[in-house]
Amino acid sequence: MKNNYISTCIVYLMAALLLISVISIKECTADISDYGDPCSDDLKDYCIHGDCFFLKELNQPACRCYTGYYGSRCEHIDHN
């Protein structure tokens, strides 16, 4: 009985890890306009490796990073 329980747990764990892997490789396809308006010209270089948009509700700029980059201003490269 104990071995059966362990086998069942392993199967569920493997399925969960596979699901996480599939979800993590899916690329975001949302339009930047879904997040806010494009940044003004004075903020055009705010995002180092990404697109800048302005969040009206927070009254601040934000970035949508290009694939392979992350950080609040897309300043870090993902080496994985």
UniProtKB/Swiss-Prot annotation:
GO terms for cellular component: extracellular space. The keyword Secreted applies. Is the major venom component. The lineage of its organism: Eukaryota, Metazoa, Ecdysozoa, Arthropoda, Hexapoda. It comes from the Eukaryota. Disulfide bonds join 39-52, 47-63, 65-74. Expressed by the venom gland. One of its GO terms (biological process) is positive regulation of mitotic nuclear division. InterPro entries: EGF-like_dom. Belongs to the EGF domain peptide family. Keywords: Disulfide bond, EGF-like domain, Neurotoxin, Secreted, Signal, Toxin. It is found in: Secreted. Residues 1-30 form the signal peptide. This is OMEGA-myrmeciitoxin(02)-Mg1a. GO terms for molecular function: epidermal growth factor receptor binding; growth factor activity; toxin activity. Ant peptide with probable defensive activity which acts as a potent agonist of the mammalian epidermal growth factor receptor (EGFR) (EC(50)=6.3 nM). Mimics, both structurally and functionally, vertebrate epidermal growth factor (EGF) peptide hormones. In vivo, intraplantar injection in mice causes long-lasting (several days) hypersensitivity of the injected paw to both mechanical and thermal stimuli. Its long-lasting effect is unusual for venom toxins whose effects are usually immediate. Residues 35-75 form the EGF-like domain.
